[in-house]
Amino acid sequence: GYTRTFIYGGDSHFDNMTHYFSHNGFDIVDRRKSYRLKEDLPTHRTRIEDDQVSFENAWAVCDADVYNTLLKVVDAQHKSKQPFFNFVMTTSNHKPYTYPHGVVDIPSGKNREGAVKYADKTFEDFFRKAITKPWFKNTVFVIMADHCAYSAGRTELNIKNHHIPAYIFNLKNERPTEVNKLSSQIDIFPTLFGYLNWSYTSNIFGKDISKMTRKEERAFIGNHRKVGLLKNNQFLVLETNKTHSFYDWNEHENTLTNTETDSLFLTETISYYQAAFELFKNGGLKIPNKVVVKRTH
Protein backbone atom coordinates (compact mmCIF):
# COMPACT_ATOMS: atom_id res chain seq x y z
CA GLY A 1 0.00 0.00 0.00
CA TYR A 2 0.87 3.66 0.27
CA THR A 3 3.21 5.07 2.89
CA ARG A 4 1.43 7.99 4.58
CA THR A 5 3.03 11.07 6.12
CA PHE A 6 1.58 14.20 7.73
CA ILE A 7 3.87 17.22 7.39
CA TYR A 8 3.18 20.31 9.49
CA GLY A 9 5.38 23.30 10.27
CA GLY A 10 4.13 23.66 13.84
CA ASP A 11 3.64 21.27 16.74
CA SER A 12 1.10 18.66 15.70
CA HIS A 13 -0.22 18.36 19.26
CA PHE A 14 -2.25 21.43 18.26
CA ASP A 15 -5.88 20.41 17.69
CA ASN A 16 -4.94 16.85 18.70
CA MET A 17 -3.44 16.25 15.24
CA THR A 18 -0.66 14.02 16.59
CA HIS A 19 -3.14 11.51 17.94
CA TYR A 20 -5.49 11.78 14.98
CA PHE A 21 -2.93 11.26 12.22
CA SER A 22 -0.81 8.68 14.03
CA HIS A 23 -3.88 6.58 14.82
CA ASN A 24 -4.90 6.74 11.17
CA GLY A 25 -1.62 5.27 9.96
CA PHE A 26 0.36 8.45 9.23
CA ASP A 27 3.97 9.05 10.15
CA ILE A 28 4.40 12.63 11.37
CA VAL A 29 7.00 15.25 10.45
CA ASP A 30 6.54 18.43 12.50
CA ARG A 31 8.31 21.07 14.57
CA ARG A 32 7.57 19.24 17.82
CA LYS A 33 8.13 21.96 20.38
CA SER A 34 6.49 20.09 23.24
CA TYR A 35 8.10 16.97 24.64
CA ARG A 36 6.12 14.61 26.79
CA LEU A 37 7.85 12.22 29.14
CA LYS A 38 6.14 9.37 27.35
CA GLU A 39 4.73 9.48 23.85
CA ASP A 40 3.49 6.10 22.76
CA LEU A 41 2.49 6.55 19.12
CA PRO A 42 1.65 3.72 16.72
CA THR A 43 3.66 5.45 13.97
CA HIS A 44 6.95 7.33 13.65
CA ARG A 45 7.37 11.03 14.46
CA THR A 46 10.27 13.12 13.12
CA ARG A 47 11.16 16.67 14.20
CA ILE A 48 11.96 19.52 11.81
CA GLU A 49 15.28 20.57 13.31
CA ASP A 50 16.51 24.14 13.87
CA ASP A 51 19.02 24.00 11.02
CA GLN A 52 16.14 23.33 8.60
CA VAL A 53 14.27 26.48 9.64
CA SER A 54 14.81 29.86 7.98
CA PHE A 55 11.82 31.63 9.55
CA GLU A 56 9.33 30.84 12.30
CA ASN A 57 6.47 32.59 14.08
CA ALA A 58 4.07 31.58 16.84
CA TRP A 59 2.19 29.28 14.48
CA ALA A 60 4.91 27.38 12.68
CA VAL A 61 7.86 27.58 10.33
CA CYS A 62 7.27 29.42 7.06
CA ASP A 63 5.70 27.75 4.04
CA ALA A 64 9.02 27.60 2.19
CA ASP A 65 10.56 25.54 5.01
CA VAL A 66 7.56 23.20 4.98
CA TYR A 67 7.85 22.65 1.22
CA ASN A 68 11.60 22.07 1.44
CA THR A 69 10.90 19.44 4.09
CA LEU A 70 8.26 17.90 1.84
CA LEU A 71 10.69 17.68 -1.09
CA LYS A 72 13.21 15.81 1.08
CA VAL A 73 10.53 13.43 2.34
CA VAL A 74 9.26 12.66 -1.17
CA ASP A 75 12.77 12.18 -2.54
CA ALA A 76 13.39 9.55 0.15
CA GLN A 77 10.03 7.89 -0.50
CA HIS A 78 10.69 7.75 -4.23
CA LYS A 79 14.14 6.30 -3.64
CA SER A 80 12.59 3.50 -1.58
CA LYS A 81 10.20 2.78 -4.49
CA GLN A 82 7.24 2.98 -2.14
CA PRO A 83 4.00 4.69 -3.32
CA PHE A 84 3.31 7.67 -1.10
CA PHE A 85 0.46 9.83 0.14
CA ASN A 86 1.58 12.99 1.93
CA PHE A 87 -0.77 15.38 3.73
CA VAL A 88 0.81 18.82 4.09
CA MET A 89 -0.49 21.74 6.15
CA THR A 90 0.87 25.29 5.96
CA THR A 91 0.05 28.30 8.15
CA SER A 92 1.48 31.51 6.67
CA ASN A 93 -2.01 32.74 5.77
CA HIS A 94 -2.85 33.23 9.45
CA LYS A 95 -2.39 36.16 11.80
CA PRO A 96 0.10 37.69 12.48
CA TYR A 97 0.78 37.31 8.70
CA THR A 98 4.54 37.22 9.17
CA TYR A 99 6.95 35.63 6.69
CA PRO A 100 10.57 35.96 5.50
CA HIS A 101 11.62 39.49 4.53
CA GLY A 102 12.05 40.37 0.87
CA VAL A 103 10.18 37.44 -0.70
CA VAL A 104 7.21 39.59 -1.78
CA ASP A 105 6.72 43.36 -2.10
CA ILE A 106 4.38 43.67 0.90
CA PRO A 107 6.21 43.91 4.26
CA SER A 108 5.86 40.99 6.65
CA GLY A 109 3.14 41.43 9.24
CA LYS A 110 1.30 44.21 7.39
CA ASN A 111 -1.87 42.49 6.21
CA ARG A 112 -3.53 39.35 4.89
CA GLU A 113 -2.83 40.35 1.29
CA GLY A 114 0.88 40.07 1.99
CA ALA A 115 0.45 36.63 3.54
CA VAL A 116 -1.61 35.45 0.56
CA LYS A 117 1.01 36.79 -1.84
CA TYR A 118 3.75 35.01 0.11
CA ALA A 119 1.78 31.74 0.16
CA ASP A 120 1.27 32.02 -3.61
CA LYS A 121 4.98 32.70 -4.20
CA THR A 122 6.00 29.63 -2.20
CA PHE A 123 3.56 27.54 -4.26
CA GLU A 124 5.33 28.71 -7.38
CA ASP A 125 8.78 28.00 -5.95
CA PHE A 126 7.72 24.54 -4.79
CA PHE A 127 6.29 23.51 -8.16
CA ARG A 128 9.33 24.86 -10.02
CA LYS A 129 11.44 22.48 -7.93
CA ALA A 130 8.96 19.58 -7.98
CA ILE A 131 8.62 19.58 -11.76
CA THR A 132 12.33 18.72 -12.05
CA LYS A 133 11.96 15.61 -9.88
CA PRO A 134 11.68 12.09 -11.34
CA TRP A 135 8.55 11.44 -9.25
CA PHE A 136 6.63 14.48 -10.54
CA LYS A 137 5.05 12.91 -13.62
CA ASN A 138 3.41 10.18 -11.54
CA THR A 139 2.28 12.41 -8.68
CA VAL A 140 -1.13 14.04 -8.33
CA PHE A 141 -1.39 17.22 -6.28
CA VAL A 142 -4.52 18.25 -4.38
CA ILE A 143 -4.56 21.86 -3.14
CA MET A 144 -7.37 22.81 -0.80
CA ALA A 145 -8.08 25.27 2.00
CA ASP A 146 -9.07 23.95 5.40
CA HIS A 147 -11.22 27.06 5.87
CA CYS A 148 -11.50 30.58 4.51
CA ALA A 149 -10.48 33.82 6.18
CA TYR A 150 -13.66 34.54 8.10
CA SER A 151 -15.23 31.19 8.96
CA ALA A 152 -14.24 31.08 12.63
CA GLY A 153 -16.66 31.93 15.42
CA ARG A 154 -19.19 30.47 17.77
CA THR A 155 -22.51 31.99 16.72
CA GLU A 156 -23.70 32.82 13.21
CA LEU A 157 -23.00 30.68 10.14
CA ASN A 158 -22.39 32.94 7.15
CA ILE A 159 -22.57 30.63 4.13
CA LYS A 160 -20.35 32.75 1.87
CA ASN A 161 -17.63 32.67 4.51
CA HIS A 162 -17.35 28.91 4.03
CA HIS A 163 -16.59 29.00 0.30
CA ILE A 164 -13.08 27.63 -0.30
CA PRO A 165 -11.02 26.74 -3.38
CA ALA A 166 -9.87 23.24 -4.28
CA TYR A 167 -7.66 22.03 -7.14
CA ILE A 168 -6.68 18.62 -8.43
CA PHE A 169 -3.53 19.03 -10.49
CA ASN A 170 -1.34 16.85 -12.72
CA LEU A 171 -3.91 14.20 -13.60
CA LYS A 172 -3.00 12.17 -16.66
CA ASN A 173 -5.20 12.43 -19.76
CA GLU A 174 -7.50 15.02 -18.21
CA ARG A 175 -8.32 18.39 -19.74
CA PRO A 176 -8.51 21.43 -17.45
CA THR A 177 -12.06 21.62 -16.13
CA GLU A 178 -13.83 23.96 -13.75
CA VAL A 179 -16.54 22.33 -11.66
CA ASN A 180 -19.13 24.57 -10.04
CA LYS A 181 -21.17 22.32 -7.79
CA LEU A 182 -22.29 22.61 -4.21
CA SER A 183 -19.98 20.22 -2.38
CA SER A 184 -17.73 19.81 0.66
CA GLN A 185 -14.20 18.82 1.62
CA ILE A 186 -15.32 15.24 2.20
CA ASP A 187 -15.97 14.95 -1.55
CA ILE A 188 -12.37 15.52 -2.61
CA PHE A 189 -11.15 11.93 -2.19
CA PRO A 190 -14.07 10.21 -3.97
CA THR A 191 -13.61 12.76 -6.76
CA LEU A 192 -9.87 12.09 -6.97
CA PHE A 193 -10.42 8.32 -6.97
CA GLY A 194 -12.99 8.76 -9.72
CA TYR A 195 -10.53 10.65 -11.91
CA LEU A 196 -7.95 7.93 -11.23
CA ASN A 197 -10.55 5.33 -12.24
CA TRP A 198 -10.09 3.33 -9.04
CA SER A 199 -12.56 0.68 -8.00
CA TYR A 200 -12.82 0.58 -4.21
CA THR A 201 -15.06 -0.16 -1.26
CA SER A 202 -15.47 2.56 1.35
CA ASN A 203 -17.84 3.85 4.01
CA ILE A 204 -16.82 7.50 3.64
CA PHE A 205 -19.60 10.06 3.29
CA GLY A 206 -18.25 11.95 0.28
CA LYS A 207 -19.33 11.72 -3.35
CA ASP A 208 -17.55 11.99 -6.70
CA ILE A 209 -18.24 15.61 -7.68
CA SER A 210 -17.65 14.93 -11.37
CA LYS A 211 -20.59 12.50 -11.35
CA MET A 212 -22.74 14.30 -8.82
CA THR A 213 -26.23 15.22 -10.04
CA ARG A 214 -27.94 18.48 -9.19
CA LYS A 215 -30.19 16.59 -6.79
CA GLU A 216 -27.18 15.23 -4.89
CA GLU A 217 -25.45 18.58 -4.36
CA ARG A 218 -25.14 19.62 -0.71
CA ALA A 219 -22.64 21.18 1.67
CA PHE A 220 -21.84 20.68 5.35
CA ILE A 221 -21.12 23.90 7.22
CA GLY A 222 -20.19 24.39 10.85
CA ASN A 223 -18.27 26.27 13.52
CA HIS A 224 -17.42 25.62 17.16
CA ARG A 225 -21.04 25.32 18.30
CA LYS A 226 -23.26 24.86 15.26
CA VAL A 227 -23.40 22.49 12.30
CA GLY A 228 -25.61 22.67 9.28
CA LEU A 229 -26.70 21.16 5.98
CA LEU A 230 -27.13 23.31 2.87
CA LYS A 231 -29.17 21.82 0.06
CA ASN A 232 -31.51 23.11 -2.66
CA ASN A 233 -31.12 26.68 -1.34
CA GLN A 234 -32.36 25.59 2.07
CA PHE A 235 -30.18 25.60 5.17
CA LEU A 236 -30.82 23.76 8.42
CA VAL A 237 -28.63 24.58 11.43
CA LEU A 238 -28.35 22.28 14.45
CA GLU A 239 -27.69 24.36 17.55
CA THR A 240 -26.99 23.74 21.24
CA ASN A 241 -29.56 22.21 23.60
CA LYS A 242 -31.18 20.22 20.76
CA THR A 243 -32.52 23.35 19.06
CA HIS A 244 -32.38 24.15 15.36
CA SER A 245 -33.14 26.83 12.77
CA PHE A 246 -34.36 26.42 9.20
CA TYR A 247 -33.81 28.98 6.46
CA ASP A 248 -34.35 29.74 2.80
CA TRP A 249 -31.05 30.93 1.32
CA ASN A 250 -30.83 33.60 -1.37
CA GLU A 251 -27.55 32.67 -3.02
CA HIS A 252 -27.11 35.91 -4.98
CA GLU A 253 -27.65 38.18 -1.98
CA ASN A 254 -26.32 35.68 0.59
CA THR A 255 -29.29 36.24 2.88
CA LEU A 256 -31.12 33.80 5.13
CA THR A 257 -34.86 33.97 5.78
CA ASN A 258 -36.43 31.98 8.60
CA THR A 259 -39.05 29.53 7.42
CA GLU A 260 -41.09 26.62 8.76
CA THR A 261 -38.95 23.55 9.39
CA ASP A 262 -39.10 20.71 6.91
CA SER A 263 -39.22 17.62 9.16
CA LEU A 264 -37.56 15.37 6.56
CA PHE A 265 -34.76 17.90 6.09
CA LEU A 266 -34.27 18.01 9.86
CA THR A 267 -34.09 14.22 10.07
CA GLU A 268 -31.60 14.07 7.20
CA THR A 269 -29.34 16.68 8.80
CA ILE A 270 -29.36 14.96 12.20
CA SER A 271 -28.75 11.59 10.53
CA TYR A 272 -25.64 12.79 8.70
CA TYR A 273 -23.93 14.19 11.78
CA GLN A 274 -25.14 11.60 14.28
CA ALA A 275 -24.22 8.66 12.05
CA ALA A 276 -20.74 10.10 11.49
CA PHE A 277 -20.30 10.62 15.23
CA GLU A 278 -21.46 7.12 16.14
CA LEU A 279 -19.22 5.52 13.51
CA PHE A 280 -16.21 7.53 14.68
CA LYS A 281 -16.93 6.91 18.37
CA ASN A 282 -17.30 3.16 17.94
CA GLY A 283 -14.51 2.55 15.44
CA GLY A 284 -16.81 2.14 12.46
CA LEU A 285 -14.64 4.33 10.24
CA LYS A 286 -11.50 2.25 10.76
CA ILE A 287 -10.07 0.41 7.78
CA PRO A 288 -10.71 -3.35 7.93
CA ASN A 289 -7.68 -5.62 8.09
CA LYS A 290 -8.08 -6.56 4.45
CA VAL A 291 -9.05 -3.90 1.95
CA VAL A 292 -8.64 -4.43 -1.76
CA VAL A 293 -8.34 -1.42 -4.04
CA LYS A 294 -8.41 -2.27 -7.72
CA ARG A 295 -6.86 0.15 -10.16
CA THR A 296 -8.33 0.02 -13.62
CA HIS A 297 -6.91 1.92 -16.54
Question: Across the structure, where does each feature detected by a protein language model lie?
Answer:
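Solvent-exposed soluble domains appended to multi-pass membrane proteins
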Residues: G1-H297
